[in-house]
Regions:
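N-terminal accessory segment detector
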Residues: 1-105, 111-128, 149-189
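Hydrophobic beta-strand-centered segment that forms part of the acyl-chain substrate-binding groove
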Residues: 141-149
């Protein structure tokens, strides 16, 4: 008789479900066609609702890959690496994490799954990701986090760039952008 192989702690099928990139893009396209004024908020809410399960998957993955109980136990260098590898392995795309100013992180990706390759959109379109990342990073920080996408491949930008910070910080940045500043000027970087 043989002993069953040990089961790894991180099992994506126990924490998350997979959906194809085309399904995600079609969902956004259908919502834009049928419910245009509500697309961003609807997808952000859905992403935020899914954040807890993705965070639990990240916890299990970090335990297995890095030997820590919580992602927050990793120093900044390893946390950025862990987040990039984790989202890459789940199929979302690789992220580069960098500090912008004193209170904002930038998450950059040239292959983010939610971004359409067609280009030409007027605004950044990774709404589900914004909600999802806000919940995940809020749980990492053990507080509230907000996420705002400021560059998007769907808009023909080279990359998707998500800003992560405290809600009041991103609200102030958004207000400065509404007055005509670029996001870099609004952050002061």
């Amino acid at each position: 008789m043989t002993t069953p192989a040990s089961t790894p702690a991180f099992q994506p099928n126990r924490h998350c479900i997979g959906i194809g990139r085309r399904a995600l893009l079609q969902l956004r396209a259908s919502l834009e066609r049928e419910a245009a004024p509500y697309v961003a908020s609807t997808l952000q809410e859905a992403g935020f609702a899914g954040g807890e399960e993705v965070y639990q998957a990240l916890v299990a993955w970090c335990r297995e890959e890095y030997g820590v109980e919580r992602p927050a136990e990793l120093d900044a260098q390893y946390l950025g690496e862990a987040v990039s590898r984790f989202f890459g392995e789940l199929g979302w795309g690789r992220l580069t994490v960098r500090q912008l100013g004193s209170a904002v992180l930038a998450l950059d990706s040239t292959d983010w799954a939610e971004a359409g390759d067609e280009g030409g959109s007027e605004f950044p379109s990774c709404h589900l990701s914004c909600g999802l990342l806000a919940d995940v990073f809020g749980r990492i920080a053990d507080g509230l986090a907000a996420v705002m996408e400021v560059e998007c491949r769907t808009r023909s930008d080279v990359r998707c760039r998500f800003l992560v910070g405290a809600p009041e910080t991103l609200a102030a940045i958004y207000e400065r952008m509404a007055q005509g500043l670029s996001y870099a000027e609004a952050i002061g970087s």
